[in-house]
Amino acid sequence: MMPRTIIEKIWDQHVIKKGEGKPDLLYIDLHLIHEVTSPQAFEGLRQKNRKVRRPQNTFATMDHNIPTVNRFEIKDDVAKRQVSALERNCEEFGIRLADLSSVDQGIVHVIGPELGLTLPGKTIVCGDSHTSTHGAFGALAFGIGTSEVEHVLSTQTLWQQKPKTLEIRVDGKLQKGVTAKDVILAIIGKYGVKFGAGYVIEYTGEVFRNMSMDERMTVCNMSIEAGARAGLIAPDETTFEYVKTKKYAPKGEDFEKAVEEWKNLKTDPGAVYDRTIVMDGSAISPMVTWGINPGMVLPVDETIPGPEAFLQEDDKKEAQRAYEYMGLEPYKKIEDITIEHVFIGSCTNSRMTDLRQAAEMIKGQKVADGVRAIVVPGSQSVKIQAEKEGLHKIFIEAGFEWRESGCSMCLSMNNDVVPEGERCASTSNRNFEGRQGKGARTHLVSPAMAAMAAIHGRFVDVRKYYQETTAV
């Protein structure tokens, strides 16, 4: 057999029927659902008098539009109906549900891994674009639309076009203060928001190997912002150790057998990718987005580019729109940009590694006057663990609001929004116009950078913190 990439191996293992020039029919191992993109799919099943094909392969939670304060008091009528519909649909069709009273509840892309539902080699889908997060485990995971949600519920399969393969290799040692979020933002900043279109990315190299699972999830999460269908990292001992104790993961002998199989989930020597990109990790800085897409991003110690930096006419127009929407002038220093809000959370950066990183920055400090800062754990499990470690006390004493789990301020579908014209340092994944509220101005950063912005009321190079602590 010809040498294959891990992407090709997982794909080939799940093809039920080859399309012969058309999409292949894939078997889906795990289907994650939430309250926003599933109601119409269940209604479609009822209209066609169909059952859920494999309810044991489906898991549900509510996350997108739930409150993170007084979580049982949902005031928005649409949100209330969606949450009620999910409860009713899961009961009727026999699907496991982590509801608002469950310790398993959380953002769908946080709870899948922490419950051991996400495993190497699986095909995983969800009606949410950031399903690529689960690729951190060596799974082929991608978002689907509502009609596809219905198709998977009723057949446990999906027609999919086989993707091209893209290797992104990053070697070297990251500087102190440079995080997984900075790595993926640097990649998108260099190559743009469309370069991954038609590809599934495999992240390789020393930098990704040295990352924790939480950090790998951050990288794979934002594969979508690079335009890719999905992103993954081959499983290794870090992966196996993480999975070992999880609730739904194989146990005992079954786990050992699974690990032996998972060890084969790696790209063969001599396998050829359709494209390869190589970057030097040691050259990456803490990053801050300045514009209206994640590709408009710069190292924190640089200045906003002027119109002459954009060679294509469309790019010039996009930059002009960004200047106007974000209320920023060309050549302004990133470190001179002041903020009114800080959001630490989302499926990108709401896990224990993220909260510990932010807490380290703010311990003994106070949130700057005029800044509202909130921390939203990605799951109830993360919240419980953070409270065991006393992180909530560090945040609260500094002036942060400590919330219940949910998607929160990542998107303006719930009570947590940024007021029009105000600026937010956010650990989420999208800085589109209106993403955090009408007229809201979003700057994407790492948890450490967000924490520093909360303290200073503006963007500050987090590397200075490490220089100061080293000097002491």
Swiss-Prot record:
Role description: Catalyzes the isomerization between 2-isopropylmalate and 3-isopropylmalate, via the formation of 2-isopropylmaleate.
List the protein's name.
3-isopropylmalate dehydratase large subunit
Q: Write one Pfam family the protein is assigned to.
A: Aconitase
Class of enzymatic activity (EC top level): lyase
The family classification in the record reads: Belongs to the aconitase/IPM isomerase family. LeuC type 1 subfamily.
Q: Which NCBIfam families match?
A: leuC (TIGR00170), PRK05478.1 (NF004016), PRK12466.1 (NF009116)
The answer to keyword DNA repair applying to this record is: no
An annotated GO BP: L-leucine biosynthetic process
Pathway-wise, it operates in: Amino-acid biosynthesis; L-leucine biosynthesis; L-leucine from 3-methyl-2-oxobutanoate: step 2/4
Gene3D superfamilies reported in the protein's UniProt record = Aconitase, domain 3 (3.30.499.10)
Cofactor binding note: Binds 1 [4Fe-4S] cluster per subunit.
Its domain of life reads Bacteria
Which organism is the protein's source? Bacillus licheniformis (strain ATCC 14580 / DSM 13 / JCM 2505 / CCUG 7422 / NBRC 12200 / NCIMB 9375 / NCTC 10341 / NRRL NRS-1264 / Gibson 46)
> Which gene is transcribed and translated to give this protein?
leuC
Quaternary structure (record): Heterodimer of LeuC and LeuD.
